[in-house]
Amino acid sequence: RLDQYAFICQEMNDLMAQGVRNVIEMTNRYMGRNAQFMLDVMHETGINVVACTGYYQDAFFPQHVATRSVQELAQEMVDEIDQGIDGTELKAGIIAEIGSSEGKITPLEEKVFIAAALAHNQTGRPISTHTSFSTMGLEQLALLQAHGVDLSRVTVGHCDLKDNLDNILKMIDLG
């Protein structure tokens, strides 16, 4: 948790002692991300924290996801990549964790996936997705691919929570 500074610093020091130099922090906007906390941990421990930008899934979206355009949502992500997060010098290095609901991609989730694709196409940053109970991974990839994303730059999260080896192999074949 991002409220346990001493504990996290010790964990990062332990990782550094094992040769780890980079960690990816997948807590995105409106899910408790704390850019200054990450910067403080980086400065204290020397580890590099790769922060993310994006929106999680429909049930967790802030209201403005419904009212802003795809282009505006994409620009917010690009700004966090190019300019920094929450007024800090910490810049997002990955577009994540872009999620879908169990068994469906809602219209707002589709909007966010398209915005993530636009941000990826503009910045080249990789995308990491969230599947709910291993559903919709293939559909996520199809949506991203339809909007010009190089699928070798995408990871599909939590796709192994059900016995669906055929789907996993299909996703691997896509990139």
Regions found by a protein language model. Name each.
Residues 29-30, 56, 134:
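Conserved beta-strand edge residues that scaffold enzyme active sites
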Residues 9, 13-14, 21, 34-38, ...:
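Histidine/acidic residue-rich metal-binding segments in metalloenzymes
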Residues 24-26, 50-52, 156-158:
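Active-site neighborhood of phospho(di)ester-bond hydrolases with catalytic His/Asp-centered motifs
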Residues 1-3, 53-71:
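Active-site gating loops and adjacent loop-to-helix segments of metal-dependent hydrolytic enzymes
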Residues 24, 31-35, 58-61:
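Short active-site-adjacent helix-start/loop capping segments
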Residues 1-9, 27-30, 62, 101-107:
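Divalent metal-binding segments
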